[in-house]
C-alpha cells in the first residue's frame, strides 16, 4: 500500500466519512434493485477488458464461483455495499478510459504496465487488486484528471 501518497490519503478520508454516514448503497432495497444491471455491466466490461476471471473476481470482491455465474448470466444474487461500490468505481473507470483514449487503448489500458507515480510499474488492474477500494478510487480520480486535462 502507498500510505503517504496524496490520492490514497484523500480517498481514505472520504471512505471514513462515508462509513460515518449510511454511505453509498447502504439501502438493501437499492442494492437488490441495482444488482442485476451492475452484474450485466461488469460482465460486459470485464469481457471488453479481457481481464482473467480471477482478476475480475478480485476487483469486484466476489468469489470465482460467483464471477463465473455472473459471466454466464446465471446469477440472481444481490451485491453487498462493498461490491456495488466496486462496480460503481469500475463503471467510472471504464467511462473515463473511453473519454480519454480510443476504443482499443481504452480496453487495453487496464492491463498495461504503467510507470506513473501512482502505479510504479504495476498494471492498473494489479494496483486495484492490491490496493482494494482505495486503489480503485485513486485510479478513477487519476483518469478523471486526464479527462479534465490536468
Identify the residue ranges that each predicted region occupies.
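Non-transmembrane "mature" sequence context
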Residues: 1-150
Amino acid at each position: 500500500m502507498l500510505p503517504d501518497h496524496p490520492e490514497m490519503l484523500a480517498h481514505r478520508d472520504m471512505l471514513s466519512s462515508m462509513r460515518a454516514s449510511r454511505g453509498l448503497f447502504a439501502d438493501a432495497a437499492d442494492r437488490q434493485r441495482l444488482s442485476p444491471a451492475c452484474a450485466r455491466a461488469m460482465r460486459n466490461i470485464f469481457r471488453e477488458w479481457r481481464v482473467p476471471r480471477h482478476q475480475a473476481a478480485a476487483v469486484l470482491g466476489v468469489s470465482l464461483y460467483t464471477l463465473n455465474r455472473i459471466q454466464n448470466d446465471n446469477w440472481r444474487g444481490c451485491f453487498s455495499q462493498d461490491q456495488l461500490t466496486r462496480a460503481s468505481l469500475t463503471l467510472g473507470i471504464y467511462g473515463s478510459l473511453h473519454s480519454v483514449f480510443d476504443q482499443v487503448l481504452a480496453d487495453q489500458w487496464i492491463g498495461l504496465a504503467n510507470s506513473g507515480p501512482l502505479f510504479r510499474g504495476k498494471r492498473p488492474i494489479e494496483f486495484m487488486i492490491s490496493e482494494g477500494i482505495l486503489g480503485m478510487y485513486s485510479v478513477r480520480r487519476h483518469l478523471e484528471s486526464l479527462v479534465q486535462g490536468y
